[in-house]
Amino acid sequence: MIFWKNFFQNSNINASSEKNFKKLIVLDKTCDKIEFKDIYLSSNKNINLYELEQLCDSVGWVKRPLKKVKIALKNSSIIISLIQKKDANSKLVGFARATSDNGFNATIWDVVIHPDFQGLGLGKVVIHQLIQQLRQAEISTITLFAEPDVVSFYKKLGFIKDPDGVKGMFWYPR
């Protein structure tokens, strides 16, 4: 339990509530000047499927049938999205979700940050928020599946690869 307390106390996420959104203080230091990004965190489960599809396309994910994506979202315990608001427009720039047995275990799925917003700590924000909500629900085991090129990112957030030699197993129809 000490690990989780330190995990969230050491978080440098600044947010203030605004209805269903939390405004994040995000600075883009990649250009010559420091620029503020108007990004809000939401746990609203009503996600525009077409915006989500565009976000997934932006990182090169394989297209999935929207009908099945809708079912997956409906069956998710937690959905976190990051929305950039500019004037009257808004854009989905980050997303992740978790499924759970609501007793012991949960799995994090579909963590995606738009390429224009990667490197700003937003992936860390999304994962921290999911873990925080799952721990509040007293979920003790949180798993995820990661592509080889992002395993180091999750290790930095406290995830352990193959703990105690445990291996994930899959069954696929032939």
Swiss-Prot record:
<comment type="similarity">
    <text>Belongs to the acetyltransferase family. Ycf52 subfamily.</text>
</comment>
<keyword id="KW-0150">Chloroplast</keyword>
<dbReference type="InterPro" id="IPR045039">
    <property type="entry name" value="NSI-like"/>
</dbReference>
<keyword id="KW-0934">Plastid</keyword>
<dbReference type="InterPro" id="IPR016181">
    <property type="entry name" value="Acyl_CoA_acyltransferase"/>
</dbReference>
<keyword id="KW-0012">Acyltransferase</keyword>
<dbReference type="Pfam" id="PF00583">
    <property type="entry name" value="Acetyltransf_1"/>
</dbReference>
<protein>
    <recommendedName>
        <fullName>Uncharacterized N-acetyltransferase ycf52</fullName>
        <ecNumber>2.3.1.-</ecNumber>
    </recommendedName>
</protein>
<dbReference type="GO" id="GO:0008080">
    <property type="term" value="F:N-acetyltransferase activity"/>
</dbReference>
<keyword id="KW-0808">Transferase</keyword>
<dbReference type="InterPro" id="IPR000182">
    <property type="entry name" value="GNAT_dom"/>
</dbReference>
<feature type="domain" description="N-acetyltransferase">
    <location>
        <begin position="42"/>
        <end position="174"/>
    </location>
</feature>
<dbReference type="GO" id="GO:0009507">
    <property type="term" value="C:chloroplast"/>
</dbReference>
